[in-house]
Amino acid sequence: MVGVNSLRSALYLIVLILFVQLTYFSDARVMDVDLSRAFLPLTGIGCGESCVWIPCVSAAIGCSCSNKICYRNGIIPKK
């Protein structure tokens, strides 16, 4: 029974720590950062494939290869 009680106490402690951290996190002011330009800067819509060894399979829907990545309808990034 000692093992069960210590396991239960450890579980309660973990739940308490998580609750306190989540409560503190919701009260903290978090800056909203727009990361869309960091991951896809002015490149239009990514077609979801690379064209390192073979050309874009999605060329039928208007994708083209630039810098080893397929893009569609956007400003193609500089190399």
UniProtKB/Swiss-Prot annotation:
Q: Name one GO biological process term.
A: defense response
Q: In which tissues is it expressed?
A: Expressed in midvein, lamina and periphery of leaves (at protein level).
Propeptide at which positions?
1-43, 74-79
What does the entry report about post-translational modification of this chain?
A: This is a cyclic peptide.
Question: Known InterPro entries for this protein?
Answer: Cyclotide, Cyclotide_bracelet_CS, Cyclotide_sf
Where would I find the Cyclopeptide (Gly-Asn) crosslink on this chain?
44-73
State the disulfide connectivity: 47-63, 51-65, 56-70
Question: Which SUPFAM superfamilies does the entry mention?
Answer: Cyclotides
Alphabetically sorted, this entry's keywords are: Disulfide bond, Knottin, Plant defense
**Which family does this protein fall into?**
Belongs to the cyclotide family. Bracelet subfamily.
The role this protein plays is:
Probably participates in a plant defense mechanism.
Q: What is known of its domains?
A: The presence of a 'disulfide through disulfide knot' structurally defines this protein as a knottin.
- Name used for this protein in its record: Cyclotide phyb-A
What species is this protein from?
Petunia hybrida
